[in-house]
Amino acid sequence: MASQLTDAFARKFYYLRLSITDVCNFRCTYCLPDGYKPSGVTNKGFLTVDEIRRVTRAFARLGTEKVRLTGGEPSLRRDFTDIIAAVRENDAIRQIAVTTNGYRLERDVASWRDAGLTGINVSVDSLDARQFHAITGQDKFNQVMAGIDAAFEAGFEKVKVNTVLMRDVNHHQLDTFLNWIQHRPIQLRFIELMETGEGSELFRKHHISGQVLRDELLRRGWIHQLRQRSDGPAQVFCHPDYAGEIGLIMPYEKDFCATCNRLRVSSIGKLHLCLFGEGGVNLRDLLEDDTQQQALEARISAALREKKQTHFLHQNNTGITQNLSYIGG
């Protein structure tokens, strides 16, 4: 195995977020309010199963332990189960997760688990069906809820649910969410609304700091848990009276980037060192056959030396991220 991926600030990288499509069938107000519009896809299209196999093998050899498949909506790919199986071939990768809108969860989650999936994140921004419809543009609340139940039935011991925190939309619904997870092993993750190139007006109107919820959770006796090295950026809280947990992802908090442990590869094969970084490093020309493995690993390692210490969201610099479907949020 090659040496562990480490940047100039001594941060070690165990976690790859791999986008496999930027297509999504939902029209979430904070991401794709006008629906999906094709952009950035080369004549080659999205990464193939073989290309995904090669890029994840390279990251595994460089110390990656966790791969999250993202989009867009990853389950819209007809070969999604094959993609899971291809990533699963790497023994060094201990966790394979997906972030999904839940559209196909009820139908397909059992086959995903059989292929090797170990974790699921489902996006649910409201527990009110009408508000869910208003946020996502899809009247699929009951279908998504049935999908979460199906995930438990398929054998997943815990399901993570992502909720984008928005002022005057859902920030005041904490009690409703807490009641939902009291007897369910769900880790409910409130994610601060992040500014993107296309979402500046929405951000100014609806952003609220996750610290408001953190202060309330601590007041109610919730306990902050320690992070594991391959965990994502969430601050996780537990309570003895609840089967579920609460996670808070607060990218505007001081030192948020100090514990960064993840890199991103887009659906067209570009390595992105930060969700809100500039440009990207092309890897696709080194994904054509297995003989390029060593060169691929060398390019990834060399690129990491250019990773910045922090994002520049506080300066209203959102980099190339026009919307969160582009490189998978």
UniProtKB/Swiss-Prot annotation:
Cofactor descriptive note: Binds 2 [4Fe-4S] clusters. Binds 1 [4Fe-4S] cluster coordinated with 3 cysteines and an exchangeable S-adenosyl-L-methionine and 1 [4Fe-4S] cluster coordinated with 3 cysteines and the GTP-derived substrate.
GO biological process: one example: Mo-molybdopterin cofactor biosynthetic process
Occurrences of domain Radical SAM core (ranges): 8-234
Coiled-coil spans in chain: none
GO molecular function, one term: GTP 3',8'-cyclase activity
Binding site for GTP: 17, 68, 99, 160, 262-264
Domain of life: Bacteria
Residues at which [4Fe-4S] cluster 1 binds: 24, 28, 31
Pfam entry (one): Radical_SAM
Catalytic activities: GTP + AH2 + S-adenosyl-L-methionine = (8S)-3',8-cyclo-7,8-dihydroguanosine 5'-triphosphate + 5'-deoxyadenosine + L-methionine + A + H(+)
Cofactors that this protein relies on: [4Fe-4S] cluster
Pathway as given in its UniProt record: Cofactor biosynthesis; molybdopterin biosynthesis
Binding site for [4Fe-4S] cluster 2: 257, 260, 274
Enzyme class, spelled out: lyase
Family: Belongs to the radical SAM superfamily. MoaA family.
Subunit architecture: Monomer and homodimer.
Primary role: Catalyzes, together with MoaC, the conversion of 5'-GTP to cyclic pyranopterin monophosphate (cPMP or molybdopterin precursor Z). Catalyzes the cyclization of GTP to (8S)-3',8-cyclo-7,8-dihydroguanosine 5'-triphosphate.
Alphabetized PANTHER family for the sequence: GTP 3',8-CYCLASE, MOLYBDOPTERIN COFACTOR SYNTHESIS PROTEIN A
Protein name: GTP 3',8-cyclase
Species this chain originates from: Escherichia coli (strain K12)
